[in-house]
Amino acid sequence: MKIAIPNKGRLQGPALQFLNSVGIKPMANDDRALMVPTSWEGVQLVTIRTEDIPNIVETGAVDLGITGLDYVMESGADVEELVKLDFGKSRLVLAVPMSWNIEDPRDMPKNVRIATKYHNIARAYLERKGIEARLVKISGAAEIMPSLGAADAIIDVTSTGTTLKLHGLKPIDVVSESYAMVIGNKNWMKSEEADRINLVLTMMKGALSARGKKMIFMNVDDVNLEAVVSSLPAMLAPAVSKLSNSNAWEVVTVTDEEMLPEVIAKAKTAGARDIVVVNIEKVIK
């Protein structure tokens, strides 16, 4: 099976890190390679322009793709969102020069020139808002266009707004929200690779479910068992098993990382000892 990933840009690094957490690691170090074998037998990575991934997935040429919601919306590709990822969060915004004393997009001059590479999204947004504008099609950085005089405003992706500010621009409206996702062809379940695809998706969801969670092991004397167990959070309930040749028990539970100090403090107060904390790679539901 083939998984399409961005060949560059803001999603490439996080996509590779995510696949690594799943256990899918590229087995070639040559950046020029466009199709790369992985640590999973029968699974290949294909590096494609992020904006092309939705259409390539739609054709069935690749089985899965990692891209952004903004690119899926812009392409109009008939694909299925299979896994929502926890990276690539951004906003598509309408930004104007800071010198413009406006906050409402409807206050822009008629036939304002807006530079964007998201023509379909921008057109739908402008129609929805009833704004008369002329779209300037670009494929590179939009932020520089007003400074060059090639456009008056832009519609582009921003995460922090720092780049906009650097180029003397300010956002006045959010056109849409975006995030990274795993997409598939609408007919992926009928594919010859359906079983392998399903396993990959299961492992992807498992890796996401494990993010920010810790597993805690502790020993507890018989007399303190009830107090310790009642103090602990768990996904269902703490696991308890008797230690051989001892009046003590091993208790195992899972908690969110931010709750860890509080959980350990309560467990120790209740009588737990020999506490060991380990990372969790995957939680398969």
Swiss-Prot record:
Concerning Pfam families, the annotation shows:
HisG, HisG_C
- Catalytic reactions on record: 1-(5-phospho-beta-D-ribosyl)-ATP + diphosphate = 5-phospho-alpha-D-ribose 1-diphosphate + ATP
Give the CDD domains listed for this entry.
PBP2_HisGL4 (cd13594)
Record key words, sorted: Amino-acid biosynthesis, ATP-binding, Cytoplasm, Glycosyltransferase, Histidine biosynthesis, Magnesium, Metal-binding, Nucleotide-binding, Transferase
Checking Gene3D superfamilies in the record gives:
3.30.70.120, Periplasmic binding protein-like II
Enzyme class, UniProt record, top EC level: transferase
Instruction: Report a single Gene Ontology molecular function.
Output: ATP phosphoribosyltransferase activity
User: Which GO annotations describe the biological process of this protein?
Assistant: L-histidine biosynthetic process
NCBIfam families recorded: hisG (TIGR00070), HisG_C-term (TIGR03455)
Q: Can you say what this protein is called? A: ATP phosphoribosyltransferase
